[in-house]
């Protein structure tokens, strides 16, 4: 190598960290993207809340309401006579009424370990 190609660089000529500008692919654009994403999410949630508050989708929601069909004169169910003892409770046939007493002392003695 010849002497003309060798150049010495002094410490004052080296680039410092403050002099180097960040490139377009670094974290310089991270804050605007993050702020834009957060603002977009907030605006979208506010629009959804406003639509729910003002009942903008009421006609679409009305099809999900379930109501009994209106009674017509023909083709309806025949009227069934209700029993006299119908008190609104469902009877449990597992335990028959009148069989066994609750306070029997001998029932504990039948089981042994």
UniProtKB/Swiss-Prot annotation:
Cytoplasmic side: 51-113
Top-level taxon: Eukaryota
Region (Disordered): 1-22, 66-113
Localization in the cell: Membrane; Early endosome; Recycling endosome; Cell membrane
GO cellular component terms, semicolon-separated: early endosome; plasma membrane; recycling endosome
Chief subcellular location: membrane
Membrane side Extracellular: residue ranges: 1-29
Annotated coiled-coil segments of the chain: none
Its membrane topology: Single-pass type III membrane protein
Entry function: May be involved in membrane trafficking between endosomes and plasma membrane.
PANTHER family listed in its UniProt record: LEUCINE-RICH REPEAT-CONTAINING PROTEIN 19 LRRC19 FAMILY MEMBER (PTHR31450), TYPE III ENDOSOME MEMBRANE PROTEIN TEMP (PTHR31450:SF3)
UniProt name for this protein: Type III endosome membrane protein TEMP
Organism: Homo sapiens
Species lineage: Eukaryota, Metazoa, Chordata, Craniata, Vertebrata
